[in-house]
């Protein structure tokens, strides 16, 4: 009788131990798959714990859409409309979330609000930003005035730029050529050129990232009617972008991050349509430049961290 009791007890111990090991494995896998967002609370938060409707475009999804602009990628998100993204290169863009106008949508770059003071509604020009410099995009749909002010009445678009790689030194380069054909004019000549490169890495105390990107597009005329004998000029578009980031670890608790960014676009635009082409001249030009720099110290303490973003 005693021997049977001992054997049964040993069997139960083995079963309970195996079940416990399986439980730990499931918990570990759930932590790895957790998707984190920051637009909702300005702090890293699990997406399923967010009280807002947030769509995140990951770096993997961006890499699967080569050649597309930031505006074209955003236009694929339900509830987001980027007016003008399917038009000729250089076309001015309007962005709308749930029917709200440009001034009711806030654009963030690395968590910092950006705008264009030269415009009437001072909204940020998405044409300035190349998709090759973007790490991920978060779109929060719905009012967020309590966090970001009245400029976020219908939504927030938080664009996170790329940063240093985990390797000591790494680099990346690309070059692409495309045509600029339309449904009417099947132009097969090379007229769309995109090129760029980046280098990043880290040492014991320093991280760095630098990127140079450029785009040159011959362009087309949007007002040229089909089968017309009137000559209309093409409207070229060019963009040049520099981005540099550097971080320094002062102590185990204090880190200093610096960044500098220069964006420039130039493009021609069409004059009024009069069926003669006389108003569509090469004098119709516009250009836009933006220079941003910032400093972001981060201090860690026992129960959290203090971060200051300035730009």
Where do the protein language model's features map onto the residues?
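Residues that define the transmembrane beta-barrel architecture of outer-membrane proteins
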Residues: 151-153, 189-195, 202, 236-240, ...
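Short acidic/polar hinge/loop motifs at secondary-structure boundaries
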Residues: 113-141
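Transmembrane beta-barrel strands of outer-membrane/channel proteins
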Residues: 171-179, 210-216, 258-264, 308-310
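Extracytoplasmic beta-strand/coil segments of soluble accessory domains associated
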Residues: 71, 75-113, 135-136
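Outer-envelope beta-barrel architecture signal
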Residues: 103-105, 167-173, 204-208, 240, ...
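Flexible loop and strand-edge segments within Gram-negative outer membrane beta-barrel domains
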Residues: 23, 217-223, 229-243, 247-249, ...
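N-terminal periplasmic "start-of-domain" segments of outer-membrane beta-barrel proteins
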Residues: 35-65, 94
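N-terminal periplasmic accessory domains that precede
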Residues: 35, 70-73, 93-96, 108, ...
């Amino acid at each position: 009788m005693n021997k049977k009791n001992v054997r049964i007890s040993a069997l139960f111990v083995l079963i309970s131990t195996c079940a416990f090991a399986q439980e730990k494995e499931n918990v570990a896998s759930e932590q790895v798959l957790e998707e984190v967002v920051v637009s909702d609370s300005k702090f890293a938060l699990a997406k399923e714990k967010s009280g807002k409707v947030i769509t995140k475009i990951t770096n993997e999804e961006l890499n699967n859409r080569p050649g597309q602009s930031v505006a074209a990628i955003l236009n694929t998100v339900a509830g987001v409309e980027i007016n003008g993204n399917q038009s000729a290169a250089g076309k001015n863009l309007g962005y709308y979330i749930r029917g709200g106008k440009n001034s009711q949508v806030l654009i963030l770059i690395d968590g910092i609000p950006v705008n264009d003071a030269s415009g009437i509604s001072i909204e940020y020009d998405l044409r300035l930003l190349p998709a090759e410099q973007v790490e991920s995009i978060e779109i929060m749909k719905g009012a967020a005035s309590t966090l970001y002010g009245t400029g976020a009445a219908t939504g927030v678009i938080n664009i996170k730029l790329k940063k240093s790689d985990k390797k000591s030194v790494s680099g990346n380069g690309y070059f692409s050529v495309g045509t600029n054909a339309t449904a009417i004019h099947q132009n097969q000549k090379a007229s769309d050129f995109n090129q760029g490169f980046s280098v990043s890495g880290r040492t014991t105390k320093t991280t760095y990232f630098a990127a140079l990107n450029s785009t040159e597009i011959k362009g087309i005329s949007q007002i040229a009617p089909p089968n017309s004998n009137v000559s209309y000029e093409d409207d070229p578009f060019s963009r040049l972008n520099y981005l540099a980031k550097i971080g320094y670890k002062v102590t185990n608790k204090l880190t200093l991050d610096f960044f500098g960014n220069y964006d420039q676009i130039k493009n021609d635009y069409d004059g009024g349509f009069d069926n003669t082409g006389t108003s569509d001249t090469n004098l119709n030009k516009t250009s836009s430049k933006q220079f941003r720099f910032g400093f972001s110290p981060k201090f860690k303490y026992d129960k959290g961290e203090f971060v200051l973003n300035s730009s």
